[in-house]
């Protein structure tokens, strides 16, 4: 309840409507899954699981269940500083992400966030995806301060760590197996991110 109230305060502060839902279920994952389906929820935001021991997965059991059983946007976050102190948002975008149905939605999220915070949104993507990003931003998000850099090889994701400072938000766009922009290198993401 405390976290729900805190989330409501945060969304109100940035003019994002939030409808609070209370549900009792067998476990947290099934409660979220059933609520998402019943209420046609399109986006779920959850914190990054705290790895308690060596056998725990990087994303944890909850995120694993949500990824397997839901087909909606899942934002797994770990903020080390207050959001309002961010100076830049660095977004790594995989090839062919522009062909995914969620492309405009996450673009909207990060452009709105950059605009609200008054910080730059720096996209790293290949040439084709960058062209789609630029077109969408010119159409719908002209006011957002943006930068674009080439990220030719998704395996070079660790190169981005040199671009990220303590007051930056690193966003890595990923896709589920079987989708157009899915790449087998996504399986390495948890290991790369934990470094």
Language-model segments: residues:
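Short, well-ordered alpha-helical microsegments
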Residues: 29, 130, 157-158
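Well-ordered alpha-helical segments embedded in enzymatic catalytic cores
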Residues: 6, 31, 105-109
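Inter-domain helical "communication" segments and dimerization helices
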Residues: 6-14, 140
């Amino acid at each position: 309840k405390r976290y729900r109230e805190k989330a409501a305060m945060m969304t109100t502060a940035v003019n994002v409507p939030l409808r609070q839902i209370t549900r009792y279920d067998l476990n947290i994952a099934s409660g979220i899954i059933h609520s998402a389906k019943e209420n046609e929820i399109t986006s779920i935001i959850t914190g990054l699981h705290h790895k308690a021991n060596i056998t725990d997965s990087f994303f944890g059991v909850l995120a694993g269940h949500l990824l397997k059983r839901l087909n909606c946007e899942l934002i797994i976050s770990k903020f080390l500083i207050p959001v309002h102190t961010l100076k830049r948002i660095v977004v790594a975008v995989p090839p062919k992400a522009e062909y995914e149905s969620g492309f405009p939605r996450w673009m909207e999220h990060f452009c709105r966030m950059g605009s609200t915070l008054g910080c730059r949104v720096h996209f790293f993507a290949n040439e084709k995806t960058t062209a789609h990003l630029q077109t969408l931003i010119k159409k719908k998000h002209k006011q957002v301060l943006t930068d674009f850099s080439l990220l030719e090889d998704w395996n070079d994701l660790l190169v981005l760590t040199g671009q990220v400072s303590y007051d930056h938000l690193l966003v890595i766009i990923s896709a589920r197996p079987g989708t157009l922009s899915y790449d087998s290198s996504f399986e390495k993401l948890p290991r790369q991110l934990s470094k």
